[in-house]
Swiss-Prot record:
NCBIfam families recorded: PRK13261.1-6
GO molecular function, one term: unfolded protein binding
One Pfam family hit: UreE_C
Organism of origin: Helicobacter hepaticus (strain ATCC 51449 / 3B1)
Location, primary (coarse class): cytoplasm
Name used for this protein in its record: Urease accessory protein UreE
Matches recorded under CDD domains: UreE
Length: 174
């Protein structure tokens, strides 16, 4: 089966009369635009999205839908460090450390907590900085990922000049 676009999300439709088949993926695979996937019922899916979702695939995204069957994305749970800073300077230290480690950061609106995939170095930093956290087994959904919506500094635009030349010389040779 070939999938070229996401139809919607199961949360937005009534799927009580449909056979639900799930494609399980890890949170870090949700940004993929092209993938070969297998559903729990053995359906092979060649996903080649014409346009990648803005923030990635979400839990419950619909890959296929007809009158009898629906195939959805199911993001696998993983170990997560959950943090709820109580003061602005704790938040600043936390964001600095997470950014310094290049670890993605998620915000769970239901629990009002920041979440990061479990990494031992981050846990050690949180302990050393006395920042309260708990380790939980949960789903990291793309819709909850904190992203920079615009580039802080745009990439330089390089233009090759037709008058550009390089001369290489070696010292000491006559």
């Amino acid at each position: 089966m070939r999938v070229e676009h996401i139809i919607g999300n199961i949360k937005d439709i009534d799927a009580t009369h449909l056979d639900i088949d799930e494609v399980q993926i890890a949170w870090y695979d949700t940004k993929k635009k092209i993938a070969r996937l297998n559903s729990q019922n053995g359906q092979v899916i060649a996903m080649k999205l014409a346009q990648a979702p803005k923030y990635g695939l979400n839990n419950g995204d619909i890959l296929f839908l007809d009158e009898h069957k629906i195939i959805i994305i199911s993001i696998l749970p993983t170990w997560v460090l959950c943090m709820k800073p109580t003061h602005w300077h704790t938040m600043a230290r936390l964001c600095y450390e997470i950014g310094n480690l290049h670890i993605p950061l998620f915000y769970n609106k239901d629990t009002m907590k920041l979440q990061a995939p479990f990494e031992q170095p981050l846990q050690r930093i949180l302990e050393k900085q006395s920042i309260a956290f708990e380790k939980k087994w949960c789903v990291l959904d793309s819709k909850d990922r904190i992203n920079i919506t615009y580039p802080i500094a745009s990439e330089p635009k390089l233009i090759q000049s037709p008058h550009f030349s390089i001369k290489i010389t070696q010292k000491g040779l006559n």
